[in-house]
Amino acid sequence: MTFQFNFTIEDHLENELTPIRDGALTLDSSKELSVSESQKGEERDRKCSAEQFDLPQDHLWEHKSMENAAPSQDTDSPLSAASSSRNLEPHGKQPSLRAAKEHAMPKDLKKMLENKVIETLPGFQHVKLSVVKTILLKENFPGENIVSKSFSSHSDLITGVYEGGLKIWECTFDLLAYFTKAKVKFAGKKVLDLGCGSGLLGITAFKGGSKEIHFQDYNSMVIDEVTLPNVVANSTLEDEENDVNEPDVKRCRKPKVTQLYKCRFFSGEWSEFCKLVLSSEKLFVKYDLILTSETIYNPDYYSNLHQTFLRLLSKNGRVLLASKAHYFGVGGGVHLFQKFVEERDVFKTRILKIIDEGLKRFIIEITFKFPG
């Protein structure tokens, strides 16, 4: 089974990031901010304006407090748990919210993959991984050139601006390996790839026969330029995937259009994303499985993440979360998040796997304590 994904970087960043194969893919081993303590404080407290980051009008951030977010309209979640969760908010300043929107699948799928170079990555026994590599040109994205912002600030994360969606973080591969080892079943399930970035987790669910897959990332550019091309590149006919007569870098594959209807794409902050999907005219069916990797690095986001699980996870569903034990420089980590969850008494957590290579990492399952 071929597994392809698009990873977009700028030429001048290729030496700055860690290449896996000829600079085609970057895998960061720590998700630690390479900024000073004073810079970290400034990033947490700074208010981002459209003028400061040269954002166009259609990418304006919504600056409003968490208290103004609309309450959940769903009735499936335990009411007592929801009430408890709302009454236990974290201390400290809440990040500004970015409006959520849905991204339509382009009609011209062939054009989306034009001038893309497909390369196969080594190291996976049961899944063949390939890269669709493109170059991000500044002139094409003058308003939201988040890669340049990240580079100029010497940081992989810019709070409220860029949340790391252009990198493939290490724990993503841990979770992919767990899927294979634990024989995780996706067939017939509705799946959310939360904080999707390149979309590898959701693409795995897509290939595994999920009935519906939603991809969400904070940045709209990540969805348009990374996630969408990856999904299209991976929705190919099996006979073309197995064609070895042409080298990977030359092969042009026809999109499996009949399967793409199962995929939907969203950008924006988590609470705004919840409001968007729950406010649709059609009755929203909650997710059987939420997949997320390296999303608990910042304690300021824990309340929104917890509320997202509460509002969108089906009563018998589960979350599979991959994370490092601790994120130096931003303060989050597994034990702090587990404590946060335990205090709210809504979900229970279970450690499925511990990876001791390099920085200690975990695969965690999250389910409702009282699903009834």
From Swiss-Prot:
Report biased composition (Basic and acidic residues) as residue ranges.
39-49
- UniProt cross-references to InterPro entries, sorted A to Z: Methyltransf_16, SAM-dependent_MTases_sf
Report which reactions are catalysed by this protein: L-histidyl-[protein] + S-adenosyl-L-methionine = N(tele)-methyl-L-histidyl-[protein] + S-adenosyl-L-homocysteine + H(+)
- Provide one Gene Ontology cellular component: cytosol
Ordered alphabetically, the record's keywords are:
Cytoplasm, Methylation, Methyltransferase, Nucleus, Phosphoprotein, S-adenosyl-L-methionine, Transferase
GO BP annotations, alphabetical order: peptidyl-lysine monomethylation; regulation of ribosome biogenesis; regulation of rRNA processing; regulation of translation; regulation of translational elongation
The enzyme's first-digit EC class, named in words, is transferase
Pfam families reported for this sequence: Methyltransf_23
The GO terms describing molecular function are: heat shock protein binding; protein-L-histidine N-tele-methyltransferase activity
Q: Does the keyword Glycoprotein apply?
A: no
PTM sites of type Tele-methylhistidine: 154
- Any idea what job this protein has? Protein-L-histidine N-tele-methyltransferase that specifically monomethylates RPL3, thereby regulating translation elongation. Histidine methylation of RPL3 regulates translation elongation by slowing ribosome traversal on tyrosine codons: slower elongation provides enough time for proper folding of synthesized proteins and prevents cellular aggregation of tyrosine-rich proteins.
Question: Its family?
Answer: Belongs to the methyltransferase superfamily. METTL18 family.
Task: Spell out the protein name for this chain.
Answer: Histidine protein methyltransferase 1 homolog
The species this protein was found in? Homo sapiens (Human)
